[in-house]
Structure formats: C-alpha cells, structure tokens
Regions:
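Exposed acidic/polar residues on beta-strands and adjacent loops within beta-sheet cores, strongest
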Residues: 24, 97-101, 153
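A general lysine-centric signal
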Residues: 2-3, 130
C-alpha cells in the first residue's frame, strides 16, 4: 500500500518539477533575449524558430486595433536595418508583469512591454517551443502605437 502511494505521489509531483524547470529555462532564455535585444546584438535571429510568426497589434489613431502579421524574412531584414537607428536613439524595451502558462507542448510568456518613452506599457506575448535542448520563440506578438505597420508591405 505504501509503495503504491509513493508511485502515485511521484507521478503527480514529477510533471510539476518538469514544468517548474521549463518555466525557469524559458524565463532565463527570455532574459537573455531581452538583454541581447536591448544591446542590439546580431544574434537575435537565433532566438526564433525558422518562419516564426511575428504579429503587431496596432492601436489605430482613429480607435480600434488591427493585427498585422509580418513575414519572418521581412522581420529579419527590418530587424537588421533598424538596429542602427535604435542604437543611436538608445531604444530599449523592458518587460514587466511576466507570466508563463503551458499550452500543449509549448509555453506562452505574457508580459507588459514598456518601450523607451512609454508610461503605461503595452501587451506582448511570446510562445516558446522546445527545439533540441533549447527554447525558441515560435510566435511573437506585441501591441504598438506605431502606425507604419498598417501600411507596410
């Protein structure tokens, strides 16, 4: 009886330990990502899976929101091109109120993104998936007030 109880208990506790370790690994990966992004590192593409989904939720000036999906190859080009300007103006994002939830085999990290001159912050989320022994961004979604995303091709 005691042995059966221990087996049942261990099958209940083990998944919780794995979940806790995954959350810690994802948070550590995200911290590195933010540090690299804020230092304009050229290795940012390494944090993403190939053809990751990139979404910008634009707060429209006339009211409402519009989701814009950016092709990953275009995102990489823009990332490379805009990093010099971001460096000149010392643009950085901070992420507060971070939460992680498990979604099937992936994890969703939700946070409030506080850009350089923003006072209130904007919603953001990243979906991480396991690739080999590391966690990669499968989807990135950020709310923005930048209107150019509405007309970008």
């Amino acid at each position: 009886m005691k042995k059966a109880f221990l087996i049942i208990l261990s099958t209940l506790i083990f998944p919780l330990c794995v979940f806790a370790n995954d959350k810690e690994d994802i948070m550590a990966t995200f911290d590195k990502y933010v540090k690299d992004a804020n230092s304009y590192s050229t290795n940012l593409p390494n944090y993403y899976i190939e053809n990751a989904k990139i979404v910008r939720i634009v707060n429209k000036k006339q009211g409402g929101k519009k989701a814009v999906v950016i092709p990953f190859d275009r995102y990489l080009k823009e990332l490379k091109g805009h990093s010099n300007l971001a460096k000149v103006v010392n643009y950085k994002n901070n992420y507060i109120d971070r939460k992680i939830e498990k979604i099937d085999n992936d994890y969703k990290l939700s946070a409030t993104r506080v850009p350089r001159n923003d006072k209130t912050g904007l919603p953001a989320h990243f979906i991480f998936t396991k690739v080999g022994n590391s966690w990669k961004i499968k989807e990135e979604s950020m709310t923005t007030n930048v209107q150019v995303f509405l007309t970008a091709k």
